């Protein structure tokens, strides 16, 4: 990454503002300029525009060196440069200009590859791709569209060969290309030991042959300058021969005089120049450019005169660049910076989920079980694809539920928070109403901290933040302070900037957008705004106002993605980040005020997303209370779930047993999240009272104690340590199952009703009434099979056959769990099952099988696409159905329960 030396990103605005220094504007004045200065100014402006197009949009600010009282145009060379930068016929769709005094502004909208004209477009903008190809006798640079198509062809070629072979991405065979080169007429010259000065070659330049003459004494520098573009062109086409020392008109051998070069230095210069060429592989190869160099003696009148240098270049499997592509990005941490070759290619064609051909099963699951909410083919460069489970609400439906916009109606939302804030601060309603009096259509979306909602640190002294989304107005973020605070504007600016960036780069908003800021102080006698920098110093064009309800809804749908997104389990399987969306039920729990809800019991049905909410709430705790990682403690019962959470690095994660050891360090702990609490025990002491004491030590500082549990998944009959159900207050419920396929969810519902009708004595009956609200996201196909009256060897063979089927069809061992009733049964039978599987496939190595076999209890809280339950049973018959529920809910897509007895469930 190279930082731009002369472009400066302004840190104190809620937008990306790039200062480009002094620039001469106007066609007449620019034509009078020194050519070098003119070229440097054009480069600065184009590079700044490139950075903003690729980074979510923003503003270029220029100081006009030629003062003018009258409006001036940019200048034709600047307009042409910007038009060439943007791979779109409509420059004005992305660029607007405005002059204010001696400042000139270029307003840049984020690039998006939306193919409105029906053509495919690159994901990012670039000044140069540094990719070349041969066309007849010329080397041609590829423009943005050609580059995108070239890279897409290469990617598709590898993907096609991979899909056919069902294996890892293979190297593309080189033999056929080598045969072509050896049948080339230049091959005979390449094989020669000596040539005569003035000898006429029996062939001319072509798509695979290029002549270059040594016309300078600086032969080494000349070769270095020629090689990058020509080698890139040959390698990216069909390969070819580059001959140094031939006159391209007469086709006569001239060579390079031996007084200017020697044989070894010629080879060294060629090797050095080619070794520096960047390459990118879509396939598994790691090879650089394949070439051979021959330095051939040239004789004149019987004496050695000099040398002819011939480079034979083979066609490259993927892409060869003459240098790193020239493309820029910007952020407030690094300023304006260039992209390296690998990142540029990955962003250019965006190697998203569709490129994960080796994970065909996961791709199938994605296409069959999820609905796309945000596609890479119609979004800004930094966006990740967003999918929702089939049967869950679309982003448009979520927007209407959370942020409904109505014509001729202005609303404060959420209403409950608005009423609560007004009751707590008597002057607040009047203060905000004064600001809103001119708006008749839109929303004021209130939050105790928009910063925390955006995963930033909150700020003490902020009563609330309010986001205005209104007709004929740009989005505006209001921060209301209790007392005057000089850092209030910084907080508001930082929050507004993050919101604007996330609306584009996460939410996929493709319209023009800025977020204005206003800081109000409740204690001010005149209800005036606080002092501080304001983005209003830049007068944005009217096109940045939300013109109508449709534009407001588009922006609010992007906001829904910003607020409700979380990383999907498919991200790890596909090797690229994919986002899912929370349900409204999950979001409402997550939106609770932590200052008011210091303690909460969250009861959730199996597969309703309890652990996701636990992770998200820990992130919110960190930002609300400015916590270090070790201040937040996550406690669960089993080690696998502990390890899963620990890897997220948001908290300190331990098991209950570790938490209850006498020497467990609690000094730094301020907040505690308990997960899977129904399976906790008191054999090592009263964990609940210990956690409660820790989170009540500091009366002046709020400390959080949230407990997630599901009595339906209780897997023992011992005392859990939880308070009586009636004393579990406040309490929230998660009743929508979002994990499992339809047939598995139906099975879960049946077992849940069975448990409710005949609960184990240890479970409070009232806790099971939530099964009446049980529902799931329907539309996901899957398998739920019960096979009975089988012996263990039959089970092992069946599991092996199904594993072979799934592995052959693109699943991996990481997608499969084989669960036994107890750890002893797992230890006793694992080898037999593993042996049967390995007899059929070689895809199970030692690293994978460690995570493939486990006990039902130890696997609690985790999930897999495919789950086999091996002869599930319990010593305590009263909790048999609970254990079955725990087993079945682990399976996302395919569930197989294999039993020795004829009818284990009595359905």
UniProtKB/Swiss-Prot annotation:
Q: What is the effect of changing residue 42 to A?
A: Reduced endoribonuclease activity
Spell out the GO cellular component terms annotated for this protein, sorted alphabetically and separated by semicolons: cytoplasm; nucleus; site of DNA damage
Query: What keywords are assigned to this protein?
Result: ATP-binding, Cytoplasm, Endonuclease, Hydrolase, Magnesium, Metal-binding, Nuclease, Nucleotide-binding, Zinc
What result is annotated for mutating residue 193 to A?
Reduced endoribonuclease activity
Q: Region N'-domain region: which residues?
A: 1-353
Effect ascribed to mutating residue 34 to A: Reduced endoribonuclease activity
Query: Which residues are responsible for catalysis?
Result: 205, 210
Effect seen on changing residue 146 to A: Reduced endoribonuclease activity
Cofactors demanded by this protein: Mg(2+)
In the UniProt annotation, what is the result of changing residue 281 to A? Answer: Renders the protein insoluble
Entry's localization field:
Cytoplasm
Q: What is its main location?
A: cytoplasm
What is the protein name given in its UniProt record? Schlafen family member 13
Mutagenesis or variant effect for residue 210 to A: Abolished endoribonuclease activity
Q: Which organism is it from?
A: Rattus norvegicus
Cofactor comment text = Can also use Mn(2+).
Which residues are noted in the entry as Zn(2+)-binding? Answer: 281, 283, 318
Q: What EC designation does it have?
A: 3.1.-.-
Amino-acid positions noted as binding ATP in the UniProt annotation, renumbered to this chain: 604-611
Protein's job: Endoribonuclease that cleaves tRNAs and rRNAs. Cleaves tRNAs 11 nucleotides from the 3'-terminus at the acceptor stem. Does not act on tRNA(Sec).
Its Gene Ontology biological processes? chromatin remodeling; defense response to virus; DNA damage response; negative regulation of DNA replication; negative regulation of G1/S transition of mitotic cell cycle; replication fork arrest; rRNA catabolic process; tRNA decay
Which consequence is recorded for altering residue 38 to A? Reduced endoribonuclease activity
């Amino acid at each position: 990454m190279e930082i731009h030396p002369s472009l400066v990103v302004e840190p104190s605005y809620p937008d990306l503002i790039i200062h480009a220094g002094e620039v001469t504007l106007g066609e007449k004045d620019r034509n009078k300029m020194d050519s070098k200065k003119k070229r440097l100014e054009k480069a600065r402006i184009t590079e700044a525009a490139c950075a903003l197009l690729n980074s979510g949009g923003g503003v270029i600010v220029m100081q006009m060196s030629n003062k003018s009282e009258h409006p001036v145009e940019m200048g034709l060379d600047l307009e042409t440069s910007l038009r060439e930068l943007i791979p779109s016929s409509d420059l004005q769709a992305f660029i607007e200009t405005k002059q204010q005094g001696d400042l000139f502004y270029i307003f840049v909208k984020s690039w998006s590859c939306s193919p409105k004209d029906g053509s495919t477009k690159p994901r990012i903008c670039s000044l140069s791709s540094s990719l070349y190809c041969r066309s007849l006798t010329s080397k041609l640079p590829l423009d943005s569209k050609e580059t995108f198509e070239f890279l897409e062809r290469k990617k598709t070629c590898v993907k096609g060969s991979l899909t056919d072979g069902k294996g890892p991405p293979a190297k593309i065979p080189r033999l056929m290309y080598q045969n072509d080169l050896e049948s080339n007429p230049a091959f005979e010259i390449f094989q020669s030991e000596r040539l005569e000065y003035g000898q006429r070659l029996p062939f001319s330049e072509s798509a695979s042959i290029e002549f270059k003459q040594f016309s300078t004494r600086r032969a080494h520098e000349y070769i270095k300058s020629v090689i990058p573009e020509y080698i890139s062109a040959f390698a990216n086409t069909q390969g070819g021969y580059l001959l140094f020392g031939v006159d391209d008109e007469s086709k006569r051998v001239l060579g390079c005089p031996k007084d200017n070069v020697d044989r070894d230095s010629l080879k060294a210069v060629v090797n050095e120049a080619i070794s520096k060429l960047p390459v990118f592989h879509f396939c598994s190869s790691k090879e650089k450019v394949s070439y051979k160099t021959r330095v051939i003696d040239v004789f004149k009148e019987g004496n050695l005169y000099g040398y002819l240098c011939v480079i034979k270049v083979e066609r490259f499997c993927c892409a060869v660049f003459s240098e790193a592509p020239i493309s820029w990005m910007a952020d407030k941490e690094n300023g304006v910076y260039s992209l390296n070759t690998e990142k540029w290619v990955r962003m250019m064609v965006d190697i998203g989920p569709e490129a994960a051909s080796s994970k065909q099963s996961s791709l199938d699951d994605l296409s069959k079980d999820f609905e796309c909410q945000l596609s890479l083919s119609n979004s800004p460069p930094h966006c990740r694809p967003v999918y929702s489970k089939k049967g869950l609400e679309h982003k448009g439906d979520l927007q209407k539920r959370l942020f409904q916009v109505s014509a001729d109606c202005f609303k404060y939302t959420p209403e409950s928070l608005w009423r609560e804030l007004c009751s707590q601060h008597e002057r607040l309603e009047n203060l905000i109403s004064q600001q809103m009096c001119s708006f008749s259509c839109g929303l004021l979306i209130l939050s105790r901290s928009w910063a925390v909602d955006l995963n930033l640190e909150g700020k003490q002294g902020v009563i609330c933040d309010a986001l205005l989304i209104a007709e004929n107005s740009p989005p505006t973020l209001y921060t209301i302070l209790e007392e005057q605070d000089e850092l209030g504007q910084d907080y508001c600016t930082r929050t507004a900037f993050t919101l604007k960036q996330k609306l584009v780069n996460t939410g996929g908003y493709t319209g023009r957008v800025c977020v204005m800021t206003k800081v109000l102080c409740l204690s001010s006698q005149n209800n005036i705004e606080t002092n501080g920098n304001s983005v209003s110093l830049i007068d944005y064009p009217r096109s940045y106002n939300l013109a109508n309800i449709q534009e407001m809804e588009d922006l609010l749908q992007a906001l829904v993605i910003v607020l409700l997104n979380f990383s999907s389990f498919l991200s790890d399987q596909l090797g690229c980040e994919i986002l899912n969306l929370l349900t409204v039920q999950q979001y409402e729990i997550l939106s609770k005020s932590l200052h008011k809800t210091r303690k909460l019991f969250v009861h959730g049905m199996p597969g309703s997303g309890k652990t996701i909410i636990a992770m998200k709430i820990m992130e919110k705790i960190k930002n609300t209370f400015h916590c270090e990682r070790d201040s937040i403690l996550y406690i669960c019962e089993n080690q696998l779930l502990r390890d899963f959470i620990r890897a997220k690095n948001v908290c300190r994660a331990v098991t209950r047993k570790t938490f209850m050891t006498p020497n467990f360090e609690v000094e730094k702990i301020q907040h505690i999240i308990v997960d899977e609490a129904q399976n906790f025990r008191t054999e090592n002491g009263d964990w609940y009272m210990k956690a409660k004491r820790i989170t009540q030590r500091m009366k002046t500082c709020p400390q959080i104690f949230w407990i997630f549990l599901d009595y339906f998944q209780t897997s023992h009959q011992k005392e859990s340590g939880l308070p009586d159900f009636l004393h579990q207050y406040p309490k929230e419920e998660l009743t929508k199952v979002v994990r499992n396929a339809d047939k598995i969810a139906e099975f879960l519902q049946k077992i849940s009703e069975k448990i409710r009708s005949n609960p184990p004595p240890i479970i409070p009956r009232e806790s099971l009434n939530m099964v009446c609200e049980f529902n799931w996201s329907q539309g996901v196909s899957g398998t739920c099979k019960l096979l009975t009256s089988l012996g263990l060897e039959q089970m092992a063979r069946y599991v092996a056959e199904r594993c072979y089927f799934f592995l052959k069809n693109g699943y991996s061992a990481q997608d499969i769990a084989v669960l036994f009733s107890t750890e002893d049964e797992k230890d006793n039978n694992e080898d037999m099952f593993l042996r049967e599987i390995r007899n059929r496939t070689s895809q199970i190595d030692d690293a994978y099988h460690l995570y493939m076999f486990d006990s039902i209890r130890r696997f609690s809280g985790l999930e897999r696409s495919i789950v086999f339950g091996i002869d599930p049973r319990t010593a305590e018959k009263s909790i048999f159905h609970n254990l079955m529920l725990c087993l079945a809910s682990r399976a996302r897509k395919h569930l197989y329960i294999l039993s020795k007895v004829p009818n284990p469930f009595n359905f």
